[in-house]
């Protein structure tokens, strides 16, 4: 059987090299979309990891919530969120928290499942300090005003065409190759008049 060992090794190597990539990929959402499409949006500190039943294939982070922006009704009688669950493997969209600073606050947007906050690679999770003043204002109050009747519509190729008067064309990805462009950091898609939504500045208006 020995002469066949090198051949078997070559076949296995070839299968490994040519196997399709299973990495999780997704485009980060506009922060307004993240708030509108999430059940829970909070500010929190990641303070540690907790033991989870390994058969669940989940990773659990212990957090300390410092502020809730959305989710009071979804939590029901619960007054706090202490844990965040995510798939254990990055290949299946598991979120890996890399910061070792336990005092650093993060904006975390996710959904509830079986009473636990769930996030993944595609979720909006960002250091609070990295958000612009306009984005902080948006999460605190303004983004919610556009959730019911307005939609941030991503432009992924030319020509970009709006499908509705309630859509705002988001071109940051296409023009800059980044989700952190001007529209993301400074604008919200809000009602201008009934049936019409436009990009509006999140800067405070002067009296």
Swiss-Prot record:
Record's comment on post-translational modification: The activity of TIMP1 is dependent on the presence of disulfide bonds. N-glycosylated.
GO biological process: cellular response to UV-A; negative regulation of catalytic activity; negative regulation of endopeptidase activity; negative regulation of membrane protein ectodomain proteolysis; positive regulation of cell population proliferation; regulation of integrin-mediated signaling pathway; response to cytokine; response to hormone
Subcellular location: Secreted
Cysteine pairs bridged by disulfides in the record: 24-93, 26-122, 36-147, 150-197, 155-160, 168-189
Tissues of expression: Ubiquitously expressed. Highest expression in kidney and ovary.
Site residues, Involved in metalloproteinase-binding: 37
Sugar-bearing residue positions: 53, 77, 101
Modified residues (Phosphoserine): 178
Keywords attached to this entry: Disulfide bond, Glycoprotein, Growth factor, Metal-binding, Metalloenzyme inhibitor, Metalloprotease inhibitor, Phosphoprotein, Protease inhibitor, Secreted, Signal, Zinc
Gene Ontology terms, MF aspect: cytokine activity; growth factor activity; metal ion binding; metalloendopeptidase inhibitor activity
Region entry Involved in metalloproteinase-binding, spans: 24-27, 90-91
SUPFAM superfamilies, per the entry: TIMP-like (SSF50242)
Binding site for Zn(2+): 24
Signal peptide boundaries: 1-23
GO cellular-component term (any): extracellular matrix
InterPro entries tied to this protein: Netrin_domain (IPR001134), TIMP (IPR001820), TIMP-like_OB-fold (IPR008993), TIMP_C (IPR027465)
Residue ranges of every copy of the NTR domain listed in the record: 24-147
Self-association state and partner proteins as the record states: Interacts with MMP1, MMP3, MMP10 and MMP13, but has only very low affinity for MMP14. Interacts with CD63; identified in a complex with CD63 and ITGB1.
Family per record: Belongs to the protease inhibitor I35 (TIMP) family.
Task of the protein: Metalloproteinase inhibitor that functions by forming one to one complexes with target metalloproteinases, such as collagenases, and irreversibly inactivates them by binding to their catalytic zinc cofactor. Acts on MMP1, MMP2, MMP3, MMP7, MMP8, MMP9, MMP10, MMP11, MMP12, MMP13 and MMP16. Does not act on MMP14. Also functions as a growth factor that regulates cell differentiation, migration and cell death and activates cellular signaling cascades via CD63 and ITGB1. Plays a role in integrin signaling.
Protein name as annotated: Metalloproteinase inhibitor 1
Species of origin: Canis lupus familiaris
């Amino acid at each position: 059987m020995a002469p066949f060992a090198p051949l078997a090794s070559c076949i296995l190597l070839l299968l490994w090299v040519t196997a399709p990539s299973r990495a999780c990929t997704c485009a980060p959402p506009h922060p307004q979309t993240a708030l509108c499409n999430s059940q829970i949006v909070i500010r929190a500190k990641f303070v540690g990891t907790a033991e989870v039943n390994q058969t669940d294939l989940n990773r659990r982070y212990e957090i300390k919530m410092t502020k809730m922006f959305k989710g009071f009704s979804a939590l029901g009688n619960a007054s706090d969120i202490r844990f965040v669950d995510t798939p254990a493997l990055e290949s299946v969209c598991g979120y890996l928290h890399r910061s070792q600073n336990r005092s650093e606050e993060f904006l975390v947007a996710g959904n509830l499942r079986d009473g636990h906050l769930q996030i993944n690679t595609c979720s909006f999770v960002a250091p609070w300090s990295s958000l612009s003043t306009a984005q902080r204002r948006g999460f605190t109050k303004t983004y919610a005003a556009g959730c019911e009747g307005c939609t941030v519509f991503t432009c992924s190729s030319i020509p970009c065409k709006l499908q509705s008067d309630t859509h705002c064309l988001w071109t940051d990805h296409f023009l800059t190759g980044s989700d952190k462009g001007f529209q993301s950091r400074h604008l919200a898609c809000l009602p201008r008049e009934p049936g019409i939504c436009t990009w509006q500045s999140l800067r405070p208006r002067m009296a």
